[in-house]
Amino acid sequence: MPDQATVLIVDDEKPITDAYARWLEDDYQVRTAYSGSEALEKLDDAVDVVLLDRRMPDLSGEDVLDRIHEQGLTCRVALVSAVEPDFDILELGFDAYLEKPVSDADELLETVETLLQRTTYDSQMQQFLSLATKKAALETKKSPEELKASEEYESLREELADLRAQLSDTATGLDDEDLRAEFYDPSD
């Protein structure tokens, strides 16, 4: 992630989009789109979080969400909608749901920050699991003496310990709901 995360705000109601942009622009790089089609033009790998209206006339938020997944983009998505959530949301691949009206800048800022923390947690967990797999492979093939004599193995152990601490710190910043969302599998 760059030093300042990039947030794409997508809503066909210009006053809402512009208000959200004002609330976030001091903390994040902000892009705005006033339609689903425009959102697709502004979406790229630099976008970290998308705040996406669910119902738009030209291309719905659900269609944009499908395209995000089809393109393999790794941004986090919060649906921001006046539509009360119903069971149909279970099939949608988003990370947060905000019900309009969102009239509190703090709620929007907190949502973006939480989504960014989840991204950090995912990245740290992937790195941790990759290193843990390497450590396990070495431990099954090398003798304890060889492991003890290896500077590379000791460095790996230290890196794993550091990552474990980072994961713990990041997880502390997430609440139970965030962690449930992290491990939710819609296919279950």
Regions found by a protein language model. Name each.
Residues 53-54, 60:
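Active-site residues of response regulator receiver
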Residues 3-24, 50:
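Conserved acidic segment of CheY-like receiver
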Residues 57-58, 71:
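The feature encodes the CheY-like receiver
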Residues 73-85, 98-99:
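A short, hydrophobic beta-strand element within the central beta-sheet of small alpha/beta folds
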Residues 107-120, 125:
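Receiver (REC) domain switch/output surface
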Residues 121-188:
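C-terminal output/effector regions of signal-responsive regulators
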Residues 14, 32-41, 61-63:
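Helix N-cap/capping motif at the beta->alpha junctions
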Residues 50-53, 65:
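Active-site T/S-Asp motif of two-component receiver
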